[in-house]
């Protein structure tokens, strides 16, 4: 048991170091992320397909509402990581037999990617801090959801680097919705 415990602690330390290095790399001011025309619908579909097995393991329904051919100027790799991170987070906190929705909308002014989970909500006093490094609400500090509180901080930095904005709302009626917005 002691060896297993030590191995688990070493693995968690490695994950923490990896996340901190990723955040430091993203925050480097002198790096310009190359932007190109990317079909957001295609990236959103790929992200959801990659996470279907995780949803299945948790008995969570992963639904999508995507529009066809939604092209914007962005970075494909960053966008894929952003959507995947938000979906993983939603699946992590959605209770068994719950639902997660990935929705894409676009009008003449903006493109929005929304990830919504309907079960677990974030307390109003925690909302201003969800993108802070190492922040975890008291509700999320369980052994079931091991994390360091860096995932959303990394996601926010990535969104900023590709000229998007990220926001979150949470209430018992709608659940928790993370929205990534790109101006057109």
Predicted features along the sequence, with ranges:
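Short alpha-helical segment within the cytosolic histidine kinase core of two-component systems
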Residues: 45-57
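Short beta-strand/loop element within the Bergerat-fold HATPase_c
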Residues: 97-109
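Short helix-loop "hinge" at the ATP-lid/N-box region of the Bergerat-fold HATPase_c
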Residues: 90-91
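Short alpha-helical segment of the dimerization/phosphotransfer core of two-component systems
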Residues: 8-13
